[in-house]
């Protein structure tokens, strides 16, 4: 059974694994060392998570196991749009991708953000990431094309 629910305080350390899983590695390339998570431009996604007023996270739990997470935070990261727009990150453990859980998790997060009064949410996605079409179906539009990725925005 799948449950979409808020991340519990004691589960916050698990965001490190989900951040690692969120890093898009093009097919044929070797996985990156987990030490990359200590780089400041990645660490900012999870460091002291829950201590900022705009830190929100939801998880997908299947048979008492956390298999996916979506979280937002207002920060000047790859997905930065403006100071009122949170940046969104989402990932799943490899065995739980492409099963429709992402749709459930993202819909729940977008509904939460609407209820909290956010006008929009942003994300960045690599140009060759298959998730690009998924984000477009959810209402994200490209607001900036960069060398390797797109900055996308979903107006709520």
Which residues make up each language-model segment?
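Short glycine/proline-centered loop/turn elements that form peptide/ligand docking sites
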Residues: 102, 106, 128-131, 148-154
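Short alpha-helical
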Residues: 10, 14, 66, 129-130
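A short beta-loop-alpha structural element at the N-terminal edge
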Residues: 2-17
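Hydrophobic adenine-recognition pocket in adenosine-nucleotide-binding enzymes
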Residues: 7, 90-92, 125
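Conserved acetyl-CoA-binding loop of GNAT-fold acetyltransferases
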Residues: 136-146
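Conserved acetyl-CoA-binding loop-helix of GNAT-fold acetyltransferases
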Residues: 89, 98-111, 136-137
């Amino acid at each position: 059974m799948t449950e979409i629910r808020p991340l519990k305080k004691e589960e916050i350390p698990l965001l490190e694994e989900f951040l690692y899983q969120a890093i898009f590695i093009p097919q044929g390339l070797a996985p990156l060392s987990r030490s990359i998570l200590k780089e400041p431009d990645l660490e900012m996604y999870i460091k002291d998570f829950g201590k900022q007023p705009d830190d929100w996270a939801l998880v997908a739990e299947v048979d008492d196991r956390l298999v996916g997470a979506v979280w937002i935070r207002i920060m000047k990261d790859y997905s930065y749009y403006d100071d009122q727009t949170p940046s969104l990150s989402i990932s799943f453990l490899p065995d739980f991708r492409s099963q429709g859980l992402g749709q459930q998790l993202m819909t729940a997060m977008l509904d939460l953000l609407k209820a909290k009064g956010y006008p929009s949410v942003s994300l960045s996605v690599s140009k060759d990431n298959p998730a690009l079409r998924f984000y477009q179906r959810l209402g994200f539009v490209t607001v900036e094309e960069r060398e390797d990725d797109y900055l996308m925005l979903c107006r709520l």
